[in-house]
């Protein structure tokens, strides 16, 4: 009986040790960046728009928050700190709409995020009012 109890306890201890030593990779935190409003059009608005990155599923949500006639842009830097890694996703659907961009990123990829407002002019960066973007990047990992 003692021998059976010893085997069971030893096995349980080994299993507990093995489980405590395993690590699972996890995504970073959800981040949100806000764009300044166009105060000439919406003097009382707190923000012109926002961009949110959700690492779980790699979703970029771009929401227009002001009835100002401008689009909201989610500016996302994927994997590095240079302009070569920047991507611009536009929500041109108007106030109170959200564009959901489902990205496919490797786990652990560095992400930087800003939000801006602008007026689409045919190119990803054309028409962006860069003065409405936050000065600092919000950062996380995918």
Question: What label would you give each PLM region?
Answer:
Residues 26-142:
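Post-signal peptide N-terminal regions of Sec-secreted extracellular proteins
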Residues 1-27:
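Secretory targeting and sorting signals
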């Amino acid at each position: 009986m003692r021998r059976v109890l010893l085997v069971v306890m030893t096995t349980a201890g080994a299993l507990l040790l093995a489980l405590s030593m395993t690590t699972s990779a996890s995504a970073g935190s959800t981040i949100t960046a806000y764009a300044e409003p166009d105060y000439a059009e919406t003097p009382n608005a707190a923000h012109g728009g926002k961009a949110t990155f959700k690492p779980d599923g790699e979703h970029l949500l771009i929401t227009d928050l002001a009835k100002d006639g401008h689009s909201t842009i989610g500016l996302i830097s994927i994997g590095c700190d240079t302009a070569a890694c920047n991507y611009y996703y536009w929500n041109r659907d108007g106030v109170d709409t959200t564009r959901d961009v489902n990205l496919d990123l490797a786990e652990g990829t560095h992400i930087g995020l800003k939000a801006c407002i602008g007026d689409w002019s045919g190119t990803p960066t054309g028409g962006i009012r860069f003065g409405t973007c936050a000065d600092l990047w919000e950062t996380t990992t995918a």
